[in-house]
Amino acid sequence: MFNTKIEFSKYDPELWKAIDQEKNRQENHIELIASENYTSNYVMHVQGSQLTNKYAEGYPEKRYYGGCKYVDIIEKLAINRAKKLFNADYANVQPHSGSQANFAVYTALLNPGDTILGMKLSHGGHLTHGSSVNFSGKTYNVIGYGVDKKGNIDYQEILTLAKKYKPKMIIGGFSAYSGICNWSKMRDIADEINAYFVVDIAHVAGLIAANLYPNPIDYAHVVTSTTHKTLAGPRGGLILAKNGTNTFYKKINLSVFPGAQGGPLMHVIAAKAIAFKEALEPAFKIYQKQVIKNAQVMVQSFLKKDYQIVSGNTFNHLFLLDLTSKNITGQEADIALGKCNITVNKNTIPNDLRSPFITSGIRIGTPAVTKRGFKENEMLQISDWIVHILNNIKDKNSLLGIKNEVLKLCSKYPVYI
């Protein structure tokens, strides 16, 4: 019925053109957005497979539809690999995204109006950790913690707020924090007030899988994650836990389905299974080590050039460049760098006086550039380019010259051959 040897460009040239343009953009831009990465061809291939046709509401061997024999095998592969990768004894691979994973966990453990304690978005947290524009901020009573004057998580503040407000849940994790989190200390605080401790590892899941960042699985009641970012898999979500009861795990499962979602995306779950397999291989740890090295090399380069780094260093894949003293907004930096084919995102910094649409900083991450083969020398060159652009932000000729250099570098390191 269907010819699998399709000529996409002829059938829908308008759509194909946009896809091809995006492919070229990825090849010709230096990608420094911390939450972006490049998946393998295996991951992309499986997402375009016949699995996209299959409905499989429920869980393996407990489906509401027939014909699930083979998708059961696929989902169990993904579950078992996820458990092995993160040293967990429970995994749910069905969440469509990290936000969906967080939503499912919150609704499983909380009631509307309950108090939660999460990291402020302006200090490095995530929308789903209590932002007023997100479901988490609209559904629950949110108390926010932040970082101290040195840019490190303020555990004393967490303890003080926990004792004062008695939240039902404390949320660990971040979207823009370059330090190491003390999961043990946060669990102790949660235990002191009899609260759930939930950790969102979306940004550092790949580093944790490679044993290069502390794993919260032995401390958190529940761990959530995305499967892209540092993990370099398909866009999707994941829920993990350890040392819980079957009743507890069933509660989370029911909150995912039927509580938050209907049918799982089996083509994406298969891609997750491949990504977990890739992350279990020795090459993955080598890659993650280089991700951290590349970020740290950039930090030191910026510091030597009199640029400020929030927290002063990085111990993971990202860092925040504080532009306050340079009289440049994050938005201006984002636009100027984009004109030179260097992609970052504007980002608020702790105690930022500018709006989230303007900001006083930019966030820089190294997962994608490391994936395409960049190492220390390339990162030093990129840091030099960024500084030159920001120091000469209105010099169009200078920016054009750097764009040409960026294109030359990108051509030496193709993403997809």
Curated annotation (Swiss-Prot):
Chain positions of site Plays an important role in substrate specificity: 228
Main location: cytoplasm
Pathway of action: One-carbon metabolism; tetrahydrofolate interconversion; Amino-acid biosynthesis; glycine biosynthesis; glycine from L-serine: step 1/1
GO BP of this protein: glycine biosynthetic process from serine; tetrahydrofolate interconversion
Requisite cofactors: pyridoxal 5'-phosphate
Protein encoded by which gene: glyA
Gene3D superfamilies: Aspartate Aminotransferase, domain 1 (3.90.1150.10), Type I PLP-dependent aspartate aminotransferase-like (Major domain) (3.40.640.10)
GO cellular component terms, A-Z: cytosol
Modified residues (N6-(pyridoxal phosphate)lysine): 229
Binding site for (6S)-5,6,7,8-tetrahydrofolate: 121, 125-127, 355-357
Protein name listed in UniProt: Serine hydroxymethyltransferase
Keyword Oxidoreductase recorded: no
Keywords carried by this UniProt record: Amino-acid biosynthesis, Cytoplasm, One-carbon metabolism, Pyridoxal phosphate, Transferase
MF GO annotations: glycine hydroxymethyltransferase activity; pyridoxal phosphate binding
E.C. numbers: 2.1.2.1
Function: Catalyzes the reversible interconversion of serine and glycine with tetrahydrofolate (THF) serving as the one-carbon carrier. This reaction serves as the major source of one-carbon groups required for the biosynthesis of purines, thymidylate, methionine, and other important biomolecules. Also exhibits THF-independent aldolase activity toward beta-hydroxyamino acids, producing glycine and aldehydes, via a retro-aldol mechanism.
Source taxonomy: Bacteria, Pseudomonadati, Pseudomonadota, Gammaproteobacteria, Enterobacterales
Cross-referenced NCBIfam families: PRK00011.1
Subunit details: Homodimer.
Compartments reported by the entry: Cytoplasm
Species annotation: Buchnera aphidicola subsp. Schizaphis graminum (strain Sg)
Catalysed reactions, semicolon-separated: (6R)-5,10-methylene-5,6,7,8-tetrahydrofolate + glycine + H2O = (6S)-5,6,7,8-tetrahydrofolate + L-serine
PANTHER family: SERINE HYDROXYMETHYLTRANSFERASE
Family from the record: Belongs to the SHMT family.
The keyword Zinc appears for this protein: no
